[in-house]
């Protein structure tokens, strides 16, 4: 019973961070959209769902993307030739959760992003230069409900959520580019601070206790972006005539799925929980609602995700490091259209990271 109440306590708080930080570790551009973490670890001796309470969560995420993939094939020559694109992205997430009773809660999250992108092709092709962006990202507001009464259900539970992603991040962030003469223009889609769309968020989170030490967790997340394009010029049309319909930035959907298991130590180490699981995140070729025109880099990353948590009475420290095991830059809408027009399979590329580093802390206020 004590283990269950601890586990239930952290779920609504720890759900705050991983999901919105669905950054897909690279040029498959899924930026942070408010706070979300995962249903991994126990914390606190009080049952979060049994009383009215506030929780504040802060987390940090970093990755460096530099390995180019076209489909699942790595373009190793990019690093040999020195023309790979290198993205550095840091995200600071702040989220606050209000628990109303044992069923209902609401979460508001807002990220702050700091991005650097180094390339040759955006700066004339001969010299490497960097572009930059920083500022708040897109906010998310989600209302969640547990399906079963935590006072009566002790083996497991399922939480469903519905919310919105608001376009609070700048989707036309600009930096200086060097093509013969310096010029200020929009940065690449992968380091834009927002996407300009009002998204519809749906999520399902669940856990199941196997024993007093072992439990399982799952998270399913989808954000539908009905807006088609956001008006931010990409300059893709200047690269090749076949990319003319990619001159405008698309507003893509996002998805995340996680499945794993937790082990909570006993005795003097009962505050420590370790977890392991798999994580799938990315953006689809076509959106669930509305058109899918403009430029996007669709694809996904499948990662192995070790994590740990250390819980005190009113505070929880957590960290995880998703390690990419499969990276796939899928055919975009433009790729498919050009494949039909030429009779030859066309597919673009994207840069991915090997791993990302995530850590944070949650407080009961």
Regions found by a protein language model. Give the residues of each.
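Short loop/turn motifs that connect adjacent beta-strands in outer-membrane beta-barrel proteins
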Residues: 25-28, 44-53, 65-67, 103, ...
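Residues on the lipid-exposed face of transmembrane beta-strands in outer-membrane beta-barrel proteins
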Residues: 45-46, 58-60, 94-98, 108, ...
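Residues that define the transmembrane beta-barrel architecture of outer-membrane proteins
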Residues: 52, 88-92, 133-139, 156, ...
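Outer-membrane pore/translocation modules
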Residues: 115-250
